[in-house]
């Protein structure tokens, strides 16, 4: 068992429990807790997101073998947004409104998260977002479980600027034309300015 899987096993049940206790959508009379899984199983993001779906199914199965959670069995409801950003919003609405999930684990890219955010806020759903993100967003309907630039990119730059990191003086900020790199590079550029680095 790798370290990441071990950490996920230790934290998924408490995270789900905390999320469910905070969520107004939990049906106290139901015998099951429905968990939405909103990860691409086809398209360009399937190579990354299928692993997350498989991990969630494994963790749900293991938790059910231990008697479930809060005295209830966990039931996975899996949908495939097919790496299609508008379809993410449609599938999120389906999970919350039609399938009546209590909590959802999903999305990978920032654009998929931004696509579903209005749906989760409108329907008062709860989303656990599993990867690093660019920050500059906060919602009571989302648990952002990954690092933001101030927790990841800025410490890396500080290290590279230090003597131990090589005392870097010149910087080139690269990235694809996409939400995460654009926003992270904007944050890093401002940070570098505070350290006296010129454009």
Positions of the model-derived regions?
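Sec/Tat signal peptide C-region and signal peptidase I cleavage site
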Residues: 25-29
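Structural motif
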Residues: 73-98, 152-155
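Bacterial N-terminal signal peptides
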Residues: 12-24
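Bacterial N-terminal signal peptides that target proteins for export
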Residues: 2-15
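Extracytoplasmic "Venus flytrap"
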Residues: 36-55, 79-86, 108-111, 176-182
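Short, well-ordered beta-strand elements
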Residues: 32-40, 74-78, 169-172
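Signal peptide-proximal N-terminal region
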Residues: 30, 54-76, 166, 194-198
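Extracytoplasmic ligand/sensor domains, especially the bilobed periplasmic-binding protein
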Residues: 86, 101-199
